């Protein structure tokens, strides 16, 4: 049985004062029946890990380099994230793909490095609005899945997050039927590539304007194992109801 996961991506938000929100989230879910992850900016990662120590909340990074060390100014390796207290890392987010031109092959290399460093790799995929309107959604996400997920994986260490680019931060959300179609297709693609045992261990998250008001209905969709939450993860007031909805879905 896959354990549900509520992951918060703080993106480029938060200074030291934001750790109060992390403390509040941890305090509100001291006996959480689902996995909790907060991915703060790199500048807060070590301090966030200290705040979260002893709680049910784990801390993750928002990106990593594909190599361990070297002349890569401004980059952070997976080993560095782990050393700072991270247990997971988000990879291939659409904002990274758009702002930094990251390719599926680069995301795959980063995922391999993350897994080798002992981190859980959260690999993001998703179509643009133009691709959705052109009827290309399944082709796009299946190609991203094939190109971004490494071979030879332990399914318990890999998470795939479906985030339609057009739904991120816009308030727009796909229909429940559209979410189900993508998640069911991704599961079948994973089974075809890795076999049932590995594929059924991989958690599939939905991301894109997840809020307290729509979380419960999204979590009721088949093959949705949780959420990768953006802006709504910045405060306990918004994130806690999402976590509670996921706990209800987990039974």
Swiss-Prot record:
UniProt pathway = Carbohydrate biosynthesis; gluconeogenesis; Carbohydrate degradation; glycolysis; D-glyceraldehyde 3-phosphate from glycerone phosphate: step 1/1
Question: Which of UniProt's keywords are assigned here?
Answer: Cytoplasm, Gluconeogenesis, Glycolysis, Isomerase
Would you kindly state one Gene Ontology biological process term found in this protein's UniProt entry? glycerol catabolic process
User: What are the binding positions for substrate in this chain?
Assistant: 9-11, 169, 209, 230-231
Instruction: Report the EC code(s) recorded for this entry.
Output: 5.3.1.1
Under catalytic activity, the entry for this protein gives: D-glyceraldehyde 3-phosphate = dihydroxyacetone phosphate
- Which molecular function GO terms apply here? triose-phosphate isomerase activity
Stored Pfam families = TIM
Gene Ontology annotations for the cellular component aspect, listed alphabetically: cytosol
- Catalytic positions are 93, 163
Instruction: List the InterPro entries hit by this protein, alphabetically.
Output: Aldolase_TIM, TIM_sf, TrioseP_Isoase_bac/euk, Triosephosphate_isomerase, Triosephosphate_isomerase_AS
The principal localisation class reads cytoplasm
Query: In which domain of life is the source organism classified?
Result: Bacteria
Q: Where in the cell is it found?
A: Cytoplasm
Which function does this protein serve?
Answer: Involved in the gluconeogenesis. Catalyzes stereospecifically the conversion of dihydroxyacetone phosphate (DHAP) to D-glyceraldehyde-3-phosphate (G3P).
Q: Report the PANTHER family cross-referenced here.
A: TRIOSEPHOSPHATE ISOMERASE
Kindly state the subunit structure of this protein: Homodimer.
The record's NCBIfam families line, in alphabetical order, gives: tim
Q: Which family does it belong to?
A: Belongs to the triosephosphate isomerase family.
Protein name as it appears in the record: Triosephosphate isomerase
Origin species: Ruegeria pomeroyi (strain ATCC 700808 / DSM 15171 / DSS-3) (Silicibacter pomeroyi)
Q: Which gene encodes it?
A: tpiA
């Amino acid at each position: 049985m896959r354990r549900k996961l509520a992951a918060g991506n703080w993106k480029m938000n938060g200074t030291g004062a934001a750790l109060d929100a992390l403390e509040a989230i941890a305090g509100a879910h001291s006996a959480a029946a689902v996995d909790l992850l907060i991915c703060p900016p790199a500048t807060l990662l070590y301090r966030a890990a200290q705040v979260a120590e002893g709680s049910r909340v784990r801390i993750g990074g928002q990106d990593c380099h594909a190599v361990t060390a070297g002349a890569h100014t401004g980059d952070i390796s997976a080993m560095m994230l782990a050393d700072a207290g991270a247990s997971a890392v988000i990879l291939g987010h659409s904002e990274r793909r758009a702002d930094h031109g990251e390719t599926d092959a680069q995301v795959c290399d980063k995922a391999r490095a993350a897994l080798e460093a002992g981190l859980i790799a959260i690999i993001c995929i998703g179509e643009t609005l133009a691709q959705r309107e052109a009827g290309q959604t399944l082709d796009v996400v299946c190609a991203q899945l094939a190109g971004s997920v490494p071979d030879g994986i332990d399914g318990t260490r890999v998470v795939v997050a479906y985030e339609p680019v057009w739904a991120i931060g816009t308030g727009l959300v796909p229909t429940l039927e559209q979410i189900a179609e993508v998640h069911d297709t991704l599961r079948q693609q994973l089974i075809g590539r890795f076999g049932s045992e590995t594929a059924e261990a991989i958690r599939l998250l939905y991301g894109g304007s997840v809020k307290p008001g729509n979380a419960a209905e999204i979590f009721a969709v088949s093959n949705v194992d949780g959420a990768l939450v953006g802006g709504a993860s910045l405060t306990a007031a918004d994130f806690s109801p999402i976590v509670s909805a996921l706990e209800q879905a987990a039974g």
